[in-house]
Amino acid sequence: MSDNSVVLRYGDGEYTYPVIDSTVGDKGFDIGKLRAQTGLVTLDSGYGNTAAYKSAITYLDGEQGILRYRGYPIEQLAERSTFLEVAYLLINGELPTVDELTVFKNDITQHTLLHEDVKNFYRGFPRDAHPMAMLSSVVSALSTFYQDSHNPFDEKQRNLSTIRLLAKLPTIAAYAYKKSIGHPFVYPRNDLGYVENFLRMTFSVPAQEYVPDPVVVSALDKLLILHADHEQNCSTSTVRLVGSSQANMFASISAGINALWGPLHGGANQSVLEMLEGIQANGGDVDSFIRKVKNKEEGVRLMGFGHRVYKSFDPRAKIIKAAAHDVLSALGKSDELLDIALKLEEHALSDDYFVSRNLYPNVDFYTGLIYRAMGFPTEMFTVLFALGRLPGWIAQWHEMIKEPGSRIGRPRQIYTGVVERDFVPVEAR
């Protein structure tokens, strides 16, 4: 067997499948003809060993703790770039020039308003509707307002939908928050930056204008960068799968938002905060909590540690930890939960039980503390995740649409049910 192929022996046959090279990281082999040649399909629950796509957008190495967008290390982008610049990079493949970035920002600024009729959707939602439910519903509803953008193969329509979504999602998210607390909606302002505008729409009230602290603006911008893409995760794969049916961008992104909502995906940072609050309620006894985790007492779990992909320290967690200190210091807050988090991290990183299981802090461990310090309730945490992940979803959707020979996603199954039986009338059952 050569390095360029994989041989499968089954029954009396021998079948060869070509190896697919990568520029860096995992290689694969193409099993496109497997079923036709052998009658077999592969079973890979959770897709832990299956590459559904070839992509040039994001690279991560879970063993080494590496994350790169279009080849740029996440550490450099978080330190030196801005969220909109990173969004341009992910979607277009290259960092923008000064003129390109100016045009990109101006285009987004001109599309931040929502159609006035969109307010009727919010008025129809129950008072206690979850912000993620409102977010996905309104994004899907944009398809009804922009029926000129339904053709995914029209480049002009794709680009316009991209600008509209990037511009309007902060407004949609802020309105979802306002609905949840019964406050009037605040219109966007064209003289403010992307993050400043979102914070103002979220926290301003008629009686008092919200003026965001520059440290808070910088920290949130950095958090959005760190969440902007993460290869083929659950929500991104959902966006691609829905988009493979040639659904428009609004419908595809709405599906991704719903996938992100799950507690195993975007909802993990809320679970971390609840865990820290539980330790606080127990007198801040970290040692007792660690013991319960190790002894598997009372179903206690260590949240915010470990990752499906990363087997070492999540590179994003290091950056977010520093941002947590900056935000709390700038806001003059002394947060007991941060102290508990630091103690918990110290204990876990020095305990062979956790180290041997590759349980290192992940991106969710500190984000909830930062969001909480900024004034966001826990129900908004996943909304903020979606706001950051939007450029990645859009970039992945574009890449999928433009892929030559792209086919609708249609997984196979291995059927384990009853083979066949005859129908029995209800009277005879």
Task: List the model feature ranges, each with a label.
Residues 1-429:
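Non-transmembrane, aqueous-exposed alpha-helical and coiled segments at domain scale
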